[in-house]
């Protein structure tokens, strides 16, 4: 088996990349998130989250006016999903827990939903029984609506204690079997698109002509999405306070896990960040080089610098000034080193050029304009990469290698997982089932990016695993069901029947591992097993 330092792969043929090119303990997996796949919005005692409220109150912000009420019904079809994962033969499955499914009121005093606990116990037990490691995210943007109504969710420091209470419940109920935890998924996306652009729940922010002229970097949102016309919120302050409280909640949960659970449960805990590679538009321009570095600071450094040094990046202090919150000495100490591993989610890259200073008055301050950069998709008419199904996602495989090396060198991170990486295509209802399963663009995307992950490892980055996004076609936030990210095709017209795409078959053939059943600790109320997976759903 190849070792991290010795593997040699054909630099001209990413199609031949396989498990043999990676260390024996390298983890290959795929992922999902609760709101995007579960459905069952009103089933089993689940309480509403801010995404339930947002999609119902502002259907104009979602393509087709759709929502995640049913999603792809994994709440009821999770056994099929486990069987699909078994057939794929990968090592791990990354999923998130719906905070309001286990705590409908957001905290213990509002009651623990035993049906929600049982659902996740059954999912975890099913994964382990088939040799699949669960990687669990605690927060994937779905704040319980009860806490949003009570004090504004992550706008308030009160969220820190409630998040810790929720995390402790999860550690206690599931930590005997879950050995890899992530506190937060893409807190950047939650802060910026929830509180600056207003495109995501809870839909706070403000759009002015200046913000339109200097848009934020596109990540998981279309440039042709509806402009947020709400008047609530302050995009020049709220994203920074929300991030401040996210970071404090993360650090407090990590401290709790390390002090009370890690020794007995022998697990690890980390955080997953949104990333893009920022390429200077003019590599010979000092201002563009500086702008690219600043763009990385405002996206990745905003979160990485506090958990490595205990403070925000210097560039953010300079350009945001007094609107950037400050950590107390105690908070800085708690933040510094608050991770066992770091997850990076990578999809695309941008060209970056320096932008002029905001001079239109304090009323127009926004995260978008604070960065003082302009994002470009092309250089002299040549795109940075081919277009995918979404206008924000241009394919640039070299970027994943560059961002991994950058993260290692800049923050000296000892252990990294690629926790999301994938590409979408447009949902085309005119395709036959056979045609819809031929996803050549995704297949090439995965091959090229996994190849570049291996190259980053050769560069000295300790990458311990890779998770393709996503297992299933699903509810893709502002895009609704208009695009497909899954390696498994969902037939929305046939009770969410699941069919493997070519990319899934390639992953199975290239990264299948001979797995043995691992004993699952069955602490849950088991469901009846009479419901069998239909052969139709699993035919290849």
Swiss-Prot record:
Stated consequence of mutating residue 193 to A: Reduced activity
Record-listed E.C. numbers: 3.2.1.125, 2.4.1.219
GO biological process: alkaloid biosynthetic process; carbohydrate metabolic process
Site for Controls the gate shape and acceptance of substrates, residues: 392
S-S bridge residues: 221-230
An annotated Gene Ontology molecular function: raucaffricine beta-glucosidase activity
Effect caused by changing residue 390 to G: Reduced activity
Family per similarity comment: Belongs to the glycosyl hydrolase 1 family.
Protein name per UniProt: Raucaffricine-O-beta-D-glucosidase
């Amino acid at each position: 088996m190849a070792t991290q330092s010795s593997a040699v792969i054909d630099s001209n043929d990413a199609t031949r990349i396989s498990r043999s090119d990676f260390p024996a303990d390298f983890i290959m997996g795929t992922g999902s998130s609760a709101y995007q796949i579960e459905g069952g919005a009103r089933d089993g005692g689940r309480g509403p989250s801010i995404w339930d409220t947002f999609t119902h109150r502002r259907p104009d912000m979602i393509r087709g006016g759709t929502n995640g009420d049913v999603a792809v019904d994994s709440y009821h079809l999770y056994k099929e999903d486990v069987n699909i994962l078994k057939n794929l033969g990968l090592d791990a499955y990354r999923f998130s827990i719906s905070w309001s499914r286990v705590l409908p009121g957001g905290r213990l005093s509002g009651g623990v939903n035993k049906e929600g606990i049982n659902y996740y116990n059954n999912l975890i037990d099913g994964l382990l029984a088939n040799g699949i490691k669960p990687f669990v995210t605690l927060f994937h943007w779905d704040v319980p609506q009860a806490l949003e109504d009570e004090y504004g969710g992550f706008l308030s420091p009160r969220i820190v204690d409630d998040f810790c209470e929720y995390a402790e419940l999860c550690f206690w109920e599931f930590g005997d079997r879950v050995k890899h935890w992530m506190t937060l998924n893409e807190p950047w996306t939650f802060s910026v698109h929830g509180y600056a652009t207003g495109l995501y729940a809870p839909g706070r922010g403000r759009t002015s002509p200046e913000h339109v002229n200097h848009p934020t970097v596109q990540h998981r949102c279309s440039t042709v999405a509806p402009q947020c016309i709400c008047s609530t919120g302050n995009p020049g302050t709220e994203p920074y306070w929300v991030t401040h409280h996210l970071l404090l909640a993360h650090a407090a949960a990590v401290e709790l896990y390390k002090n009370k659970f890690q020794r007995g449960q022998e697990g690890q805990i980390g955080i997953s960040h949104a990333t893009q590679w920022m390429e200077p538009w003019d590599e010979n321009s000092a201002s563009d080089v500086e702008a690219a570095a600043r763009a990385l600071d405002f996206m990745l450094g905003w979160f990485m610098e506090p958990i490595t040094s205990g403070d925000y990046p210097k560039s953010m202090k300079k350009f945001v000034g007094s609107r950037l919150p400050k950590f107390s000495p105690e908070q800085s100490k708690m933040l510094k080193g608050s991770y066992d591993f770091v997850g990076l989610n990578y999809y695309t890259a941008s060209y970056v050029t320096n932008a002029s200073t905001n001079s239109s008055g304090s009323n127009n301050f926004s995260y978008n304009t604070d960065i003082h950069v302009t994002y470009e998709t092309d250089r002299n008419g040549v795109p940075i990469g081919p277009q995918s199904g979404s206008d924000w996602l241009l394919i640039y495989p070299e970027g994943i290698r560059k961002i991994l090396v950058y993260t290692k060198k800049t923050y000296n991170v000892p252990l990294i997982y690629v926790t999301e990486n994938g590409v979408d295509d447009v949902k085309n209802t005119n395709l036959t089932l056979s045609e819809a399963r031929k996803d050549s663009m995704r297949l090439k995307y995965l091959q090229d990016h996994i190849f570049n992950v291996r190259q980053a490892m050769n560069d000295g980055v300790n990458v311990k695993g890779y998770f393709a996004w996503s297992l299933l076609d699903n509810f893709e936030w502002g895009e609704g069901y208009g695009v497909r990210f899954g390696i498994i095709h969902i037939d929305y017209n046939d009770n969410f029947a699941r069919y493997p795409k070519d990319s899934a078959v390639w992953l199975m053939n290239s990264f299948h591992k001979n797995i043995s059943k691992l004993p699952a600790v069955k602490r849950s109320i088991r469901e009846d097993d009479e419901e069998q997976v239909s052969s139709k759903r699993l035919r290849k």
